[in-house]
Regions:
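Flexible loop/hinge segments that line or gate small-molecule binding clefts
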Residues: 115-152, 264-270
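Short, solvent-exposed amphipathic alpha-helices that sit
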Residues: 59-74, 153-157, 181-200, 214, ...
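Extracytoplasmic "Venus flytrap"
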Residues: 46-65, 70, 74, 79-93, ...
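Hydrophobic alpha-helical
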Residues: 108-124, 190, 208-268
Length: 333
């Protein structure tokens, strides 16, 4: 009985400590936003917050770079806040804190329209403008979407595979997150593009959790599970680098075709080295820049087009080298 009592007390104290740490962290983040709002109100014209899928992701850092450059040009105080690792609950909490901090505008991914709709409604009721970036939240209260047409990007990826290969193809798909809207759209577009090609078969699909190590593990599993695998399609920024890490370790006589996403330095180097065959190009820098400009216009009461696609294309080794400005912006040379 005494042991059970002490276990119960220990569990209660642990719960209290964890709760205090969480609330302290939450309070610190909210304090930062509120302090930033005070600073913005005295030295800047507007205060915007960009909430990425995860802070340290290279792709989102390009979005942030574009947003920061536009913010500097338009006298905007910009904050870059969000989860260290992809977590939809932390993502939602950050948006809620931004609303509580009375910012002027929010830029964020629309990962799940049902979950985001109440928050976007709350923001709009408080006079805060909302722009989704990279991934839309259709049917929510967001005013503008700036980013890739994700279905189309998947479709042209499928067209690239058709154009670049001959004979029977067994494709393994590595996707960032199975439940993410934009990843689903990229997979669907790809499937639709190759559907009429009887020689092309989808062997399987695995999740990378938008990490290089996750992509490597997913690719290795697909290689082990499907002996006939001849091609890979990676739908998120770090998938390409992870896929080639797995194929390099896997003993196979087959020359595996690799189709990747986004012009991160490692991906472009792999394309140049012949380890990756084609890359779907997005424009993350432009997304960030255009999103800030859209918020500025909304703040001025101007009407905005609700869908602002930033374009997508496919590049191959012969399209290299990319110019430095093109690499930063993720655009085709």
């Amino acid at each position: 009985m005494k042991v059970s009592k002490w276990i119960g007390v220990g569990a209660f104290l642990t719960f209290c400590v964890v709760s205090v740490i969480f609330l302290t962290s939450l309070g610190q983040d909210l304090f930062k936003i509120e302090n930033a709002s005070k600073k913005a109100s005295t030295t800047y014209q507007y205060h915007f917050v960009l909430v990425p899928e995860e802070l340290d992701n290279e792709y989102w850092q390009l979005v942030q770079k574009g947003a920061a450059d536009a913010a500097a040009a338009h006298h905007v105080y910009l904050e870059y806040l969000g989860p260290k690792q992809a977590d939809i609950d932390d993502h939602l909490k950050t948006i809620d804190m931004a609303i509580a901090g009375h910012v002027d505008g929010i830029m964020t991914q629309g990962l799940d329209a049902k979950k985001y709709k109440p928050l976007f409604q709350k923001a709009r009721e408080k006079g805060i403008d909302v722009v989704t970036v990279d991934t839309d939240a259709e049917g929510s209260k967001r005013q503008v979407y700036v980013g890739t047409d994700n279905y189309y990007s998947g479709f042209i990826a499928g067209q690239a595979l058709i154009a670049d290969t001959k004979g029977e193809q067994y494709v393994g798909i590595v996707t960032g997150r199975l439940d993410a809207v934009h990843q689903k759209q990229r997979v669907k577009g790809f499937r639709d593009a190759v559907a009429a090609e009887k020689r092309i078969h989808i062997a399987g699909i695995e999740e990378s959790a938008i990490t290089k190590s996750g992509a490597s593990g997913a690719a290795y599993k697909l290689l082990n599970d499907h002996a006939k695998l001849t091609a890979f399609y990676g739908t998120s920024a770090l998938d390409g680098a992870g896929i080639i890490q797995a194929t390099a370790q896997y003993q196979s006589s087959t020359d595996i075709y690799v189709l990747a996403f986004d012009t991160l330095p490692d991906t472009i180097q792999a394309l140049d080295d012949g380890e990756i065959d084609a890359v779907v190009v997005q424009h993350p820098y432009e997304m960030g820049y255009q999103a800030v400009e859209s918020l500025v216009r909304l703040q001025k009461g101007e009407k905005e087009e609700p869908l602002q696609y930033t374009g997508t294309s496919v590049i191959r080794r012969e399209d290299l080298p990319l110019q430095q400005t093109d690499r930063r912006q993720g655009v085709q040379p």
